[in-house]
């Protein structure tokens, strides 16, 4: 472990504020060294944290935290904040079961003023806190720290519009590193890039001086014209139109400039906007060169960096989707792919390279992504929206109003369904089966293995209406996808094991744990495949020939597939004991996915235990 004598003296930000300003650069170096050592041993978000170190130090140095409120957007960049706020000795537990969360969490520290994990919430939350301070007569200051990637979301601009029209003492800091996870997209990003490149100004100034150098009056007039044009192009034009006092851009790695600027801003009244320019991965050469790969990392050697993983014999579900997307695009030129800023995470890198004109990254704009797809579907295209389960929640109205109500053929490829592990409850796909199956016209599918995933994606693409295929993070049971694509019968499951007495109706990722449990219980197992429409004939058949039905899903029990089975039985007037197994009615925290599933009783041992407890209880009620 690197020696960190100055950092060792900092337990809370009050200790930091006792330092001489001249000591802050040394603290930044030690904090960066500690961060590299820490994350290399635990894994986690990395490049964004390296880029936020100086800004974090300056904020805690100038502001009286925790009384003054720092509201972080997304939370990827808050490891330095956690280290400086009393959690340094727990950094070795980062994102592990029972350890520190990878994002700000209100019940973890009083310095974490707002829980977060999704993008673009900081300005709205900070405005609410600023209004609360005004209403209660408090003189506390409130700061929102938001990245340029998060500024592509409409929610951020809704909050800016509201905040700029208020008289609250709010500071919004734009941490501009020209990259959130994947490179940023859209007009706003091009606007920032054009401004920061300096080419326009450099060309204009050098050309003016060269051409008009011998004519001072004309040169002076040209400089006036330059200032007029510059005024039209600077970010101040945009943000001051929202009602903010714009300051910047400033170097986000110059502690002297940051501290001076923040001290001055802290004395100002009304909404302020500070544009800070940082470099993702700053101070660690490998991360500076490849910030995408170093955004989220597993354990690595600080000296050697990330090591390429050897090819796995089992392709992950994300890769299965990406391969299917390219294969399907080769067959049907109507296919277009849409992602809300998750090219790598959703498996669309190959598709972008092979079909750049049919690939659309709309930025962190889930609502727009869904309506954009609906418009494409209206006029003959076949859009596939690749999106995480947790982020589809942000576009629920568009899903209902713009797609399903009009019965448009949009395919939703829903990644990260179920528990996701280290990222915790903000990123878990715990609710999609419940919130999708209640929507008219929706067809909802849950594959049990890699090949079934490929075939159900094909089935979805052929369907003339809205469809969703949900699959978990990581690898499946190892069923090699078959190259040939075959549409599966809509709304039909398949009986995978014939037993007696007990029938397990398993959905998606729970099929293989159910099969293993059935070996111990001598139970029948149905791979239901479809959540909507359900295979009602198979349900009735199993109900008639078994004494207990067990539903198993990696989704909350409330409103999920178990509820759907009970509704089917009730509608048919069939009375049979039913045991519903799924995620509990509370948020499942971060940790190793296998351990979390075991805690929820959704591993093989848990299924066996629950069934035997039900049989021992001898209950005849659902």
Swiss-Prot record:
Pathway given in the UniProt record: Metabolic intermediate biosynthesis; 1-deoxy-D-xylulose 5-phosphate biosynthesis; 1-deoxy-D-xylulose 5-phosphate from D-glyceraldehyde 3-phosphate and pyruvate: step 1/1
Explain how, and how many, cofactor molecules are bound: Binds 1 Mg(2+) ion per subunit. Binds 1 thiamine pyrophosphate per subunit.
Gene Ontology BP, a term: 1-deoxy-D-xylulose 5-phosphate biosynthetic process
Keywords per UniProt: Isoprene biosynthesis, Magnesium, Metal-binding, Thiamine biosynthesis, Thiamine pyrophosphate, Transferase
- Which InterPro entries does the UniProt entry name for this protein? Dxylulose-5-P_synthase (IPR005477), THDP-binding (IPR029061), Transketo_C/PFOR_II (IPR009014), Transketolase-like_Pyr-bd (IPR005475), Transketolase_BS (IPR020826), Transketolase_C (IPR033248), Transketolase_CS (IPR049557)
PROSITE patterns xrefs: TRANSKETOLASE_1 (PS00801), TRANSKETOLASE_2 (PS00802)
Listed binding positions for thiamine diphosphate are 76, 117-119, 149-150, 177, 284, 366
Residues bound to Mg(2+): 148, 177
> One matching Pfam family, short form?
Transket_pyr
Gene3D superfamilies, per the entry:
3.40.50.920, 3.40.50.970
Question: Catalytic activity, per the record?
Answer: D-glyceraldehyde 3-phosphate + pyruvate + H(+) = 1-deoxy-D-xylulose 5-phosphate + CO2
Q: Name one GO cellular component term.
A: cytosol
One Gene Ontology term of the molecular function aspect: magnesium ion binding
Relate the protein's function as given in its record.
Catalyzes the acyloin condensation reaction between C atoms 2 and 3 of pyruvate and glyceraldehyde 3-phosphate to yield 1-deoxy-D-xylulose-5-phosphate (DXP).
Quaternary structure and interacting proteins, as annotated: Homodimer.
For this entry, the protein name equals 1-deoxy-D-xylulose-5-phosphate synthase
Q: Which gene encodes it?
A: dxs
């Amino acid at each position: 472990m690197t020696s960190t004598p100055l950092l060792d003296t900092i337990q809370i930000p009050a200790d930091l504020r006792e330092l001489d300003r001249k000591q802050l650069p040394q603290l930044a170096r030690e904090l960066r060294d500690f961060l590299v050592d820490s994350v290399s041993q635990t894994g986690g978000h990395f490049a964004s944290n390296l880029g936020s170190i100086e800004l974090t130090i300056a904020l805690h140095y100038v502001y009286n935290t925790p009384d003054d409120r720092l509201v972080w957007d997304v939370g990827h960049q808050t490891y330095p904040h956690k280290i400086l706020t009393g959690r340094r000795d727990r950094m070795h537990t980062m994102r592990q079961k029972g350890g520190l969360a990878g994002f700000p969490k209100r019940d973890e520290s009083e310095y974490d003023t707002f829980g977060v994990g999704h993008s673009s919430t900081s300005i709205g939350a900070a405005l609410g806190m600023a209004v609360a301070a005004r209403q209660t007569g408090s003189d506390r200051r409130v700061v929102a720290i938001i990245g340029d990637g998060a500024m592509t979301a409409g929610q951020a601009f809704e909050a800016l519009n509201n905040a700029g029209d208020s008289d609250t003492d709010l500071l919004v800091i734009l941490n501009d590193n020209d990259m959130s996870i994947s490179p940023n997209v859209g007009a706003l990003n091009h606007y920032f890039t054009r401004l920061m490149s300096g080419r326009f100004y450099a060309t204009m100034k050098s050309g003016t001086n060269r051409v008009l150098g011998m004519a001072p009056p004309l040169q002076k007039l040209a400089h006036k014209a330059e200032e007029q044009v510059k005024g039209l192009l600077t970010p101040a034009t945009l943000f001051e139109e929202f009602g903010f006092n714009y300051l910047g851009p400033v170097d986000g790695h110059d502690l002297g400039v940051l501290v001076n600027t923040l001290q001055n801003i802290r004395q100002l009244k009304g909404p302020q906007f500070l544009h800070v320019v940082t470099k993702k991965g700053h101070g660690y050469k490998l991360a500076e060169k490849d910030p995408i790969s170093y955004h989220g990392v597993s354990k690595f050697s600080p000296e050697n960096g990330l090591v390429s993983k050897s090819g796995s014999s089992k392709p992950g579900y994300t890769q299965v989707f990406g391969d299917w997307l390219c294969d399907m695009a080769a067959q049907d030129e109507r296919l277009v792919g849409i992602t809300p800023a998750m090219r790598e995470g959703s498996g669309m890198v190959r598709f972008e390279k092979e079909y750049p004109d049919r690939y659309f990254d709309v930025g962190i704009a889930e609502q727009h992504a869904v309506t954009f797809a609906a418009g494409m579907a209206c006029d003959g295209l076949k859009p596939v929206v690749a999106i995480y389960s947790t982020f589809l929640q942000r576009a629920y109205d568009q899903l209902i109003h713009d797609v399903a109500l009009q019965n448009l053929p949009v395919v939703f490829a829903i990644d990260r369904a179920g528990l996701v592990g280290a990222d915790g409850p903000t990123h878990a796909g715990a609710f999609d089966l419940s919130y999708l199956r209640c929507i008219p016209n929706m067809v909802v599918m849950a594959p049990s293995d890699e090949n079934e995933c490929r075939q159900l994606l094909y089935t979805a693409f052929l369907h003339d209406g809205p469809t969703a295929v949900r699959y978990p993070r990581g690898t499946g049971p190892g069923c090699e996808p078959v190259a040939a694509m075959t549409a599966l019968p809509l709304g039909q499951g398949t009986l995978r094991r014939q037993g007696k007495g007990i029938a397990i109706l398993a959905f998606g990722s729970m099929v293989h744990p159910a099969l293993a449990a059935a070996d111990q219980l001598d139970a029948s197992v149905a791979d239901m495949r479809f959540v909507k429409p359900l295979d009602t004939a198979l349900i009735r058949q199993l109900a008639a020939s078994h004494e207990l039905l067990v539903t198993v899903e990696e989704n909350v029990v409330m409103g999920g597939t178990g509820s759907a089975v009970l509704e089917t039985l009730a509608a048919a007037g069939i009375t049979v004991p039913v045991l519903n197994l799924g995620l509990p009615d509370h948020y499942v925290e971060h940790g190793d996915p296998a351990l979390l599933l075991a805690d929820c009783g959704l591993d093989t041992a848990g299924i066996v235990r629950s069934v035997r407890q039900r049989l021992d209880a001898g209950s005849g009620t659902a």
